[in-house]
From Swiss-Prot:
One of its GO terms (cellular component) is mitochondrion. This is Mitochondrial outer membrane protein OM14. Pfam families: OM14_C. It is found in: Mitochondrion outer membrane. Present with 4750 molecules/cell in log phase SD medium. The gene is OM14. Keywords: Membrane, Mitochondrion, Mitochondrion outer membrane, Phosphoprotein, Transmembrane, Transmembrane helix. One of its GO terms (biological process) is ribosome localization. GO terms for molecular function: nascent polypeptide-associated complex binding. The lineage of its organism: Eukaryota, Fungi, Dikarya, Ascomycota, Saccharomycotina.
């Protein structure tokens, strides 16, 4: 404590004139501590938010660029329509599509799906670079 604080009857034990901070009581000290912690947490949160926004913008740019490629666009439309068809089928039937079907039907369906997926992969690999704008 400074010499003036020793003689000041109103000075609190938390007063410290050397660093310019005067705390009249523990409540003010706690409030300042909380403000500092909240400012620090806010700065960290802002940093994370800015990084998230930056990564989201980069992702959106890549998506926009990729969707200009007709191969990617056709794949997106094809795959999303298949997913919608399957979800609609399961929702309407409340059971598996192939439940109770003969093994030959299950195998033919599986082979057909695998064949279409393979064909899609081959066609995509062949034509992707032709339309790539990167």
């Amino acid at each position: 404590m400074s010499a003036t604080a020793k003689h000041d009857s109103n000075a609190s034990p938390n007063s410290d004139s050397e660093d310019g901070h005067h705390h009249n009581n523990k409540k003010e000290c706690a409030i300042e501590y909380l403000k500092a912690r909240l400012n620090s947490a806010s700065a960290v949160a802002c940093g994370y938010l800015q990084a998230f926004v930056s990564k989201t913008q980069d992702f959106a740019k890549v998506c926009f660029l990729e969707l200009q490629n007709p191969v990617v666009l056709v794949n997106l439309l094809l795959h999303s329509s298949v997913v919608c068809y399957l979800c609609n089928g399961y929702a309407n039937h409340n059971a598996r599509f192939l439940k109770g079907k003969p093994n030959s039907t299950v195998l033919a369906t599986t082979a057909g799906a695998l064949g279409l997926l393979t064909l899609d992969g081959i066609i995509s690999k062949k034509y992707y670079s032709r339309y790539d704008k990167k």
